[in-house]
Amino acid sequence: MEVISINNTNCNNINNNIDNTNIDTNSIHNKNNIDNNIDNNNIDNNSIGNNNNNIDNNNNNIANNNINNINNIDNNIDNNNNIDNNNNKNNSNNYNNIDNNNNNNNNNNNNNNNNNNIDNYNLVNNNNNNNNNSEISTPNFPYNNNNLTNLNSDNNIGVQVIFENISYKTENRNYKKQIKDEKKRKKKLEMERSNSSNSNSSYDVESSASGLQTPQQSRSSILPTNSLNISKIDQSMNPQQTRSTTNGKIEKEITILSNVSGIIEKSEMVGLFGPSGSGKSTLLDILANRKSTGTISGKILVNGKEIGDAYKKYCSYVTQDEILLQTSTVEETLKFHADLRLPGLSDQDKWKVVEQVIKDIGLTKKSKSKIGGILPGGMIVKGLSGGEKKRVSIGCALVTNPSLLFLDEPTSGLDSLNALKVMKVLMNLTVIKGVTVICSIHQPRPEIYHLFNKIMIMLKGRMIYCGNDVLNYLSSLPNQYQCPNYTNPADFILDTCHEISECDHYEEICESWETNWRDNMLAVSRIQPFNRSIEPNKSCSLLYQYKILLNRNFKDFFRNSTQYITRLSGGFMIGLLFSACFGTLSPSQEDVLKISGILFFLIAVLNLIPFTCITLFLSNREVFNSERASKIYHSLPFYLSTITTEAFIQFLVSLIVSLLVYTINHLRWNFSSFFITYFILYLINLLSDLYIIAISNITGKSDLTFIYGTTISITFLLFMGHLVPVKQLPKSFGWIHWLNPLYYGYATVMVAQFKDYPLECPNDFCQFPNGNDVLKFYNLEDWTLQKGIGIIILWICFFFVSGYWAISKLNKEKR
């Protein structure tokens, strides 16, 4: 509770057990008790839990502006425990604020003052958490400690946001198609008119002779003479085209938002209502400075100042979907965000931040639990529920202790109980820490609706209301929309929006609000000044980001048993099958083709193994896009950490295959030959991994990646020089083998195996007296090891750069 400017020198006790006690806030005289003389304005205190029932003021004075007796927050809202103070829910701090406008003990309980409201839905008690199994406690956020000097001391204070005349236009992607459709429609209409005129003229000639009425004359007494506007009919039947047309003209840009204005006071919890497609998410993206496409106009002020580059440091955004790494625990997920977003803190202080955030979101008992979900490959990891995952997403945003928190549909996909728990977490942030919360929401239950201090309503890209008395406002409109008894106000608002969008007063309502919003809202903002500045936090180095991401990648790899068991056991099985199939080989004439064949198939199989990881790459990219949109790290450290992890895995797979084949099949056994063969197999495996990563990031879809990847791989295998020797390839497309990295790998392992290698030669016939003759048969007699290894490394660099370009430039989160 924040008590402002009370100078009651004769008050020895303020008894907070105000059950069935009336408080007169208009006149505090020199009495020991606060007497309420307001008739019929009873404050039911059944739902106000105060840990300190008696506030003993030994000095008989309450110092001006220095009392912060905050009523603890009750996490269980009882529908029957309502505090009806007939006040508008304008209290941005969710506190019980008593404003003494003069020093003569006269308190003015003016309902228009934002500091004099008791919001019965925003006062809850943190001590009663058993009913909902929530562990939300009164925070003692470690940022307030003196030893954490890297963060601003006022960073836990909410901010005021004013947005004026926000408009947003985006490219009409169907512009060309709509132009073609319009031309076809006009052409068809002209043909129908010409056919109709021809048939009518011939009928007129015949009817004039017989004295019959023409069809136009016979219908004139039934149909109106006004022409039918076909374009209006088409637009009404195609909503998407309606938004991209102006007076029947197709526009290249679609107007999504038009002159949207409003104000959000500090520490308010604001609900953004409206039907689907009304522009709620677009407005949130613009306010959070996350829009990367389209044209934005208008003005956004934070604490009276225009937003700058440091604005994102003080605001956080929670997306509608919980995109989290399934194998990480709750505390590991939050620690990951703390490591990358709070580089100035020591590791001990980061853990303090993580522990406090876990308490704030009520997941203390689940801190060691994994996020859970379906892993790439189909393995299911048991973990958190949907509501708990949503709270973890909120916790990731709270790591930086933001002043402004945006949420897109935080209750989407949750049952009513989990949705209420999530919204209570947000409400506690506004009441206890003063965070300003703005969230879009769709059809909340009544208990959630009453948590909001302010309601904003969007309809067809325009703001039709922003305030705290929405029901009275709707009843004052021309059609007088009255909320029936026993009706969820949120459902009533959405139903009313549908009626307003179809009524004749829609434009009038929108224009009236756009004209008068300054008088209605800006007057409130002048009550208290804001002088808080926005300062940027430090960012961590790319090397540090790489270290943190690499650590997470290896944990994810070893916790995903399906991934590492499948890939490592797959390499073992391939090596074992090859060895069993070809058996023990000798340097005889009969085994020469077997040796070249086993080398070919080894390269071919290692080239195809990375196809098993397509879903893994796409899953990791989804997490990357979500975290990149939040500016947690740069693209390069993520890409390098991913390639490092893959290089380690391919190292193990190639080593297992090479050892098994060399040991069982008895290939040319000397260290240089084995090392070169193994190194080439490893490079081919890594190269294939890189071009699959590049293709998956270019296409963004598993089926397209598989189609393009297999096409490239089959082309590589055909022109590798084994199935068809290079000398026998047609000249028209024989040059393709020079663009084939697998050809260079195959040529190199053949040289390592047969260069100066003595072969057994029978007396009657000897096709290959030694290994050099084998190389000559494959047109590899002049091939050098350095040439093959160098060209393969160049191809690896090419696919590495292509993959990085694709992941950093393509398939970004477009908002």
Curated annotation (Swiss-Prot):
List the biased-composition ranges (Low complexity): 194-210
Family, according to the entry, reads as follows: Belongs to the ABC transporter superfamily. ABCG family.
- Presence of the UniProt keyword NADP in the record: no
Q: Please name the gene that encodes this protein.
A: abcG7
Give one Pfam family: ABC_tran
Q: Which domain of life is it from?
A: Eukaryota
Q: Where would you say this protein principally sits, based on its record?
A: membrane
Q: Does the keyword DNA-binding apply?
A: no
Q: How does it sit in the membrane?
A: Multi-pass membrane protein
Q: Which PROSITE patterns match?
A: ABC_TRANSPORTER_1, ABC_TRANSPORTER_2
> Domain ABC transmembrane type-2, which positions?
562-810
Q: What GO terms describe the biological role, i.e. biological process, of this protein?
A: aggregation involved in sorocarp development; sorocarp morphogenesis; transmembrane transport
Provide the binding site for ATP: 274-281
Q: Where is this region: Disordered?
A: 81-141, 177-249
Give start-end positions of Polar residues composition bias: 211-248
Start and end residues of each ABC transporter domain: 242-485
Q: What are the entry keywords?
A: ATP-binding, Coiled coil, Membrane, Nucleotide-binding, Transmembrane, Transmembrane helix, Transport
Q: Where is it localised?
A: Membrane
Q: Where are the transmembrane segments?
A: 568-588, 598-618, 647-667, 675-695, 706-726, 732-752, 788-808
Q: InterPro entries, alphabetically?
A: AAA+_ATPase, ABC2_TM, ABC_transporter-like_ATP-bd, ABC_transporter-like_CS, ABCG_transporters, P-loop_NTPase
- Where, if anywhere, are coiled coils annotated? 164-199
The protein's name: ABC transporter G family member 7
**Which terms does the record give in the GO molecular function aspect?**
ABC-type transporter activity; ATP binding; ATP hydrolysis activity; ATPase-coupled transmembrane transporter activity
Q: Name one GO cellular component term.
A: ATP-binding cassette (ABC) transporter complex
